[in-house]
C-alpha cells in the first residue's frame, strides 16, 4: 500500500546481460532486498508467471527475474511479453542489463575455469562476441545498464542496494561517475565528458599520490578560469537536458567525467557536479578508477 492507502504497482526487474557480468550476484542482492526472485525463468513461462503474481493480490509486489541466453527461445517470447507489459498499469517493468569489457569477461572465465555457454568448445572470447551480438537488441531496450568491469561482488551488491532499496525508490537518479581514459570509457555511460584539457595536479609532486577528494587537489582543479567556464557551460547544458531524459522514462542517467587516470581532475569535477544537482535530483557519485592510481603510489 502507498501512503494514501492505494495499491502500489508491482515492481518487476528483469536481470539479463553478458554471461560472467554478475547476474548471480545481482539476483542474490535482490533477494536480500526482499524481492521474490527466480533464476533462469524460460521466457515462454513469463506470461503465466506474471498471472500468478497478479493473482497474489500484491503479496508479490517486488519481483526480480534472471533471463538469459540459456533459453534459445529468449528473444521472440521475451519481446512479445515486454510489449504486453508496457500496456499494463498494475506492473512497472525494468530491464537491468549487466555488461563488462571483453577482457574482464575472459579473465573471469579463466579464473573460474568455466566454458562459455554459447561456445563450450571454443575459447571464451568467441562465445562472448557471439553473445554480445545476440544481446544487442535487449541491451537497447534496457532502462538500466551496469558496467561491472573492475567491480568486486561487494561493490555490485552495494550499487544494487543504492538503486533498488525501499529508501532509494524515488524515481530518476543522476549517476555521476569519474573515470580514467587509460582504462577505457565506461560502457554504461549515457553522456561522456573529457576534462583532460584542464591543468593536471598529477604534475605537482606532492599532489600526485592524492585524489580529487582531497581539498587541496579539488581547490587546485577548480581555481582555474577554464575550469569555471567549463562548469558554467556544462551545468547549464545538463540542467536543460535532465528534465527531458526524465520525461523519457529513464530511471537513471549516467554522466561520465574522464581525465587521464581517473584520480584527480575527473574526481574533483564529478563531486562538484553531483553536489550541484543534489538539491533537485537523487544523485549518486562514484569513482571507477580512483584507487588504481592511488594504490600505485603506496
From Swiss-Prot:
Chain sites annotated for binding ATP: 17-24
NCBIfam families: PRK05416.1 (NF003828)
HAMAP family: RapZ_like
Keyword Nucleotide-binding listed: yes
Entry function: Displays ATPase and GTPase activities.
Organism: Geobacillus thermodenitrificans (strain NG80-2)
Descriptive protein name: Nucleotide-binding protein GTNG_3015
Pfam families on file: PapZ_C (PF22740), RapZ-like_N (PF03668)
Amino acid at each position: 500500500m502507498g501512503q494514501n492507502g492505494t495499491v502500489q504497482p508491482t515492481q518487476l526487474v528483469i536481470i539479463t546481460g553478458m554471461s560472467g557480468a554478475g547476474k548471480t550476484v545481482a539476483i542474490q542482492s535482490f533477494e536480500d532486498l526482499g524481492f521474490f526472485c527466480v533464476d533462469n525463468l524460460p521466457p515462454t513461462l513469463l506470461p503465466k508467471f506474471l498471472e500468478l503474481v497478479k493473482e497474489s493480490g500484491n503479496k508479490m509486489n517486488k519481483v526480480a527475474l534472471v533471463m538469459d541466453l540459456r533459453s534459445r527461445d529468449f528473444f521472440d517470447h521475451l519481446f512479445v511479453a515486454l510489449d504486453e507489459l508496457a500496456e499494463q498499469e498494475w506492473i512497472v517493468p525494468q530491464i537491468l542489463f549487466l555488461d563488462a569489457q571483453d577482457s574482464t569477461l575472459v579473465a573471469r572465465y579463466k579464473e573460474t575455469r568455466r566454458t562459455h555457454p554459447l561456445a563450450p568448445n571454443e575459447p571464451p572470447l568467441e562465445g562472448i562476441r557471439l553473445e554480445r551480438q545476440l544481446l544487442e537488441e535487449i541491451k537497447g531496450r534496457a532502462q538500466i545498464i551496469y558496467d561491472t568491469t573492475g567491480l568486486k561482488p561487494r561493490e555490485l551488491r552495494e550499487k544494487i542496494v543504492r538503486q533498488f532499496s525501499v529508501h532509494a525508490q524515488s524515481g530518476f537518479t543522476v549517476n555521476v561517475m569519474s573515470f580514467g581514459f587509460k582504462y577505457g570509457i565506461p560502457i554504461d555511460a549515457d553522456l561522456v565528458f573529457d576534462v583532460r584539457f584542464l591543468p593536471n595536479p598529477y604534475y605537482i609532486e606532492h599532489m600526485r599520490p592524492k585524489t580529487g577528494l582531497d581539498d587541496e587537489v579539488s581547490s587546485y582543479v577548480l581555481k582555474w578560469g577554464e575550469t569555471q567556464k567549463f562548469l558554467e557551460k556544462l551545468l547549464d547544458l545538463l540542467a536543460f537536458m535532465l528534465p527531458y531524459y526524465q520525461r523519457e522514462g529513464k530511471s537513471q542517467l549516467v554522466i561520465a567525467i574522464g581525465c587521464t587516470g581517473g584520480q584527480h581532475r575527473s574526481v574533483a569535477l564529478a563531486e562538484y557536479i553531483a553536489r550541484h544537482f543534489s538539491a533537485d535530483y537523487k544523485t549518486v557519485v562514484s569513482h571507477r578508477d580512483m584507487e588504481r592510481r592511488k594504490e600505485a603510489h603506496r
